[in-house]
Amino acid sequence: AKEKRLKGSVFATMENVLAGYADPGVGAASSTSEIDVTEWLTGNNTIFVVATAHEQARLRPVLTVLIQQAIRAAYDAANERGGTLEQPCLVLLDEAGNIAPLRDLPGYASTARSHGITLVSIWQDLAQIKAIYGDRAQTVLNNHRAKLFGSGIADDPTLEEVSRLMGDEQRTDVNKSGDLHGPRRSISEHTSWRRLAPVDAIRRLRTGEGILLY
């Protein structure tokens, strides 16, 4: 019984992974390749990888493999030239958690820049990153040099993280008591730290506004 359940689990996983390749359009497109990776990396060229919202889950394995191959080709080309691409390469992953969640993204985030590859990934919130990468989620965030947070964030941990990254400011309060113009006056100072951008202020960002940390 245990062996049957294991086989069933393996077959179910394989079925999900290969479902995209069963698509006639995918099969026809993958039988030949018109993409010359060398030409793509040496010229002013762009590869667009797009899927409609209702097709993303089914085509995710196919698109993930395609993007992974393109990134690895860029790394290989950089290594052949001593570590850096002759012409900079931009990898822009919009809806990174939906269309093609790359297993090796934490590693790419930490090494791409040194190879002449600019990596941009766009997420809905931190919860989405953690759901995919678990303990490695913070690595994904930390290794993106620039971080742009837009308005409309509803996830409390994301709001708190933005507030923390903004840092604190020192504030000194002066209290005066007694006869302010006589000998019995008392003046005291109290120094405290507070967030530059409290969570409630970030939550109130208007459409078109954002916070860029670099």
Question: Which residues fall in each region the model found?
Answer:
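P-loop NTPase motor domains
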Residues: 1-117, 132, 192, 200-214
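P-loop NTPase motor core of the ASCE superfamily
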Residues: 44, 106-110, 128-214
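Active-site-proximal beta-strand/loop segments in catalytic clefts of secreted hydrolases
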Residues: 51-52, 124-125, 151-153
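Acidic, glycine-rich active-site loops and adjacent beta-strand->loop/helix elements
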Residues: 97, 125-127
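Structural recognition of the conserved hydrophobic beta-strand(s) that form the central parallel beta-sheet
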Residues: 118-123
